[in-house]
């Protein structure tokens, strides 16, 4: 069973013990729109630094190379390059027994990090990371900035205030874009291996915040939940976009877009072999269907201001609402 990283962490100063301690913010949000329960607890047993293996990289200091294992903690206020992280998730996500991993603090930077199975990189507000590679079973809890993260089966959880640019999602990796976060220039190569509109919500890109300029390739899937917005998305053959929230300026170059009940899609362009499906309760506005593209509007669906070009196809139920123009003029 796939493990789901859904915990953000920060360090706070404990005036009683005179040490930094770990605070975890548990935000349980399994796919398909489950509710969120937030709890805050101090794990005093994880005082930092408490073990000889725990290290602090001070501001202005640069450290290169090394491996974190066996619940080691690395607290980064300076710069760390080329670290391998293999600890932090041994007991699974949302488990207070987890004590290890890398903590990139305000002003800290971590570059070219490798996160293996059981490893966790935490990027707190004001921290930044680049060129991180995360394997299956590893994760990144992001409250700061991340550039060019590669998820090779790993997970990236974006908490409020986080910005992720250039994430590539491969091999059942998972990026969760929570409310108050922005993911830009993401490339999605996984999530739709089960076929078009298959029921899975824990691989690919899961959007409850803002996703901008996403590219969805073969086998890729973007799920836009009710509170989410996807802007300027390109979907290629074998990939799909599932919309329960808002999708703006999507281009279907052979890919599929499913607009579900409560979802809205505006200014979609359907090119050759692309397919926009507007389901019961879904709404599409200003769709352009080019040659060999296809628009399907199911019973109870709505598509307005459709532009149907020569060679494009429109398939609709008599119980759907459809208006637009084609080469013969207006239709409704």
Task: Name what the model sees in each region.
Residues 1-332:
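Long, low-complexity, polar and repeat-rich extracellular regions
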């Amino acid at each position: 069973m796939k493990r789901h990283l859904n915990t953000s962490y920060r360090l706070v100063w404990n005036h009683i013990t005179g040490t930094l301690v770990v605070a975890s913010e548990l935000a349980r949000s399994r796919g398909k729109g489950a509710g969120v329960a937030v709890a805050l607890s101090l794990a005093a047993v994880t005082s930092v630094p408490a073990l000889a293996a725990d290290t602090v990289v001070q501001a202005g200091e640069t450290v290169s190379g090394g491996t974190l294992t066996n619940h080691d903690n690395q607290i980064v206020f300076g710069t760390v390059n080329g670290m391998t992280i293999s600890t932090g998730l041994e007991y699974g996500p949302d488990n207070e027994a987890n004590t290890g991993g890398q903590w990139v603090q305000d002003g800290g930077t971590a570059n070219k990090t490798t996160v293996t199975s059981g490893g966790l990189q935490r990027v707190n507000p004001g921290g930044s990371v680049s060129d991180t590679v995360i394997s299956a079973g590893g994760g990144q809890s992001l409250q700061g900035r991340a550039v060019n993260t590669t998820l090779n089966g790993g997970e990236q959880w974006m908490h409020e205030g986080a910005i992720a640019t250039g994430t590539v999602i491969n091999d059942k990796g998972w990026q969760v874009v929570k409310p108050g976060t922005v993911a830009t220039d993401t490339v999605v190569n996984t999530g739709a291996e089960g076929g078009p509109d298959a029921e899975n919500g824990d691989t690919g890109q899961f959007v409850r915040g803002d996703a901008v300029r996403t590219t969805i390739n073969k086998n890729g899937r973007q799920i836009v939940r009710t509170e989410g917005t996807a802007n300027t998305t390109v979907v290629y053959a074998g990939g799909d976009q599932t919309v329960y929230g808002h999708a703006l300026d999507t281009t279907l170059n052979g890919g599929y877009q499913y607009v579900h009940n409560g979802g809205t899609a505006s200014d979609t362009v359907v090119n050759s072999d692309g397919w926009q499906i507007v389901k019961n309760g879904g709404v599409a506005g200003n769709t352009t269907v080019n040659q060999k593209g296809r628009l399907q509007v199911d019973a109870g669906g709505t598509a307005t201001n459709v532009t149907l070009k020569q060679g494009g196809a429109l398939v609709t139920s008599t119980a759907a609402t459809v208006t637009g123009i084609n080469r013969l003029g207006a239709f409704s």
